[in-house]
Regions:
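HAD-like aspartate-dependent phosphatase fold
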Residues: 1-167
């Protein structure tokens, strides 16, 4: 690489200069997102009581926004484990739902959970799928809209510094 014409070099310094307490931050984000969903999007107040469980998801998951599922997949798209909301899907049902054990990760319905700061999004999506399925009387949005609402309030919380100002 010829760097003679390069004037500036940037570095991604996350986890280099600072050690994050991801569990504490994600827990805070979870509560903050719940409040915004209730106050700004009209979600039922019942969701404010949803507990945060840091160990319920891991990085490397894929959210299937069309079906309300969380998938652990290989880099080749092979489904290893799947959950509908927070409930595990058995292998036979998984094969039926996905017509085998592979998914096309370029499909617009699949959203990767690929950073430590997206864990609260995945946790909350799983929980809201459970609430939607268990309480149809609440008239919650469909699965794609649930995910869209969660991502939008997360992005807004980062843009307006409302989340960081709490820290």
């Amino acid at each position: 690489l010829n760097m003679r014409k390069i004037k500036y070099v940037g570095f991604d310094m996350d986890h280099t200069l600072i050690r994050y307490n991801s569990q504490a931050f994600e827990g805070l984000a979870h509560q903050h997102l719940l409040k915004r969903l209730v106050n700004e999007r009209g979600y039922p107040e019942k969701i404010l009581k949803l507990p945060f469980d840091f160990n319920s998801v891991i990085r490397g998951l894929v959210i299937d926004s069309a079906k309300g599922n969380l998938l652990k997949v290989s880099r080749h798209g092979a489904i290893r484990v799947s959950h509908h909301g927070t409930k595990r899907i058995d292998y036979r049902q998984q094969q039926k739902d996905y017509h085998g054990t592979y998914v096309d990760l370029s499909d617009k319905n699949f959203v990767a959970v690929d950073t430590a700061f997206s864990l609260s999004v995945a946790i909350l999506f799983g929980q809201l799928v459970d609430v939607k399925d268990a309480t149809p009387e609440h008239k919650m949005p469909d699965y794609p809209q649930l995910l869209s609402d969660i991502i939008e309030v997360m992005d807004l919380s980062h843009r307006d510094d409302s989340l960081k100002s709490i820290v």
